[in-house]
Amino acid sequence: MAYFLEQTDSEIFELIFEEYKRQNEHLEMIASENYTFASVMEAMGSVLTNKYAEGYPNKRYYGGCEVVDKIESLAIERAKKLFNCQFANVQAHSGSQANNAVYHALLKPYDKILGMDLSCGGHLTHGAKVSLTGKHYQSFSYGVNLDGYIDYEEALKIAQSVKPEIIVCGFSAYPREIDFKKFREIADEVGALLLGDIAHVAGLVVAGEHAHPFPHCHVVSSTTHKTLRGPRGGLILTNDEEIAAKIDKAIFPGTQGGPLMHAIAAKAVGFKENLKPEFKAYAQLVKSNMQVLAKALQEKNHKLVSGGTSNHLLLMDFLDKPYSGKDADIALGNAGITVNKNTIPGETRSPFVTSGIRIGSAALSARGMGAKEFEIIGNKISDILNDINNVSLQLHVKEELKAMASQFPVYQQPIF
């Protein structure tokens, strides 16, 4: 496959190879990123990309779907087994598509959504004013206490006041566990449905390293990459037959046309990997590595949102620093450490500048890095931030970390 691409489009081939080198030589620590399995990429690059299959298994609008019916059915069964639930829709193209389909299925225009505030760790699709959800529905938000933990009492008071039709519990930048049971109690109190968005922690959930959203959530959405290490894509789960039927209609024909059968096959492959005992060990490593990193940073007197972490990510707090999240992002990037600037609770800077950075452990754990490496990384991050304008230091650290990264190759060959 690489041979044909090199011959037919050398520009793209060389850029892919350049990105392969970057991923190998840099330390990828963006919390939403991971290295997928080679077998997943093989399925993604298969002849399945040629097949249209509007509809669902055994209920297609196109002919020639006998094989892809088997593939999608297998993906569904594996998802149900993995998450221990009765119904699964594997067609959503992304996590955002999954969330929008849930709203389309269960809400009417201008119904009310209650989700986590964006600056406190929520996601755009949880009701942010700039997103589709903030325009088509009435959106309200809950936040965190001064200690950085979700303020469940505030969430209850807001829910009692606005009476939302759906409450979203989930995040894109929250370093602690979600208490699904508490959220269900709040939802029941006001007669709301509860959507658990576990896009970030799904891999931890299925490995028993994070609380499970079932039986508390009426419906659960997720991505299939991030901590699951599968292909880029979305997933919707439920134990309610009526909700499942509405979800299916909301995906097709409600918000999508033909499903991406190569992606669905890749999801099935990923789910099989997630069901292996080795994946539990991986999820444990993700959490333990993040604890090592948090400890290393705190020992150097760096402030973390909520005082630490209980999952795969942490947030560094620069509210009292002369430099911003953007400054830290650039400096660490120059040193070969890829993170992202992130708004944090009590934010005083713009979303394009921010007062924090988000750091994740999933990708480097997938490479096999452990406590020793994460302690080194924590110390290097501290060195860079403590002398943030020292470009020569950044370049020196980059070479040191490049040598360390070479001991943990991402893949054995550059292109699949």
From Swiss-Prot:
Where on the chain is N6-(pyridoxal phosphate)lysine found, per UniProt? 226
Q: Which GO terms describe its biological process?
A: glycine biosynthetic process from serine; tetrahydrofolate interconversion
Q: Cofactor(s) for this protein?
A: pyridoxal 5'-phosphate
Where does this one sit in the cell? Cytoplasm
Which Gene3D superfamilies does the UniProt entry name for this protein? Aspartate Aminotransferase, domain 1, Type I PLP-dependent aspartate aminotransferase-like (Major domain)
An annotated GO cellular component: cytosol
> What EC number(s) is this enzyme filed under?
2.1.2.1
NCBIfam families per the record? Answer: PRK00011.1
What is annotated about its quaternary structure and interactions? Homodimer.
- Record-linked PANTHER family: SERINE HYDROXYMETHYLTRANSFERASE
Protein name stated in the entry: Serine hydroxymethyltransferase
The species is: Helicobacter pylori (strain Shi470)
Its taxonomic path starts at: Bacteria, Pseudomonadati, Campylobacterota, Epsilonproteobacteria, Campylobacterales
The UniProt gene name for this protein comes to glyA
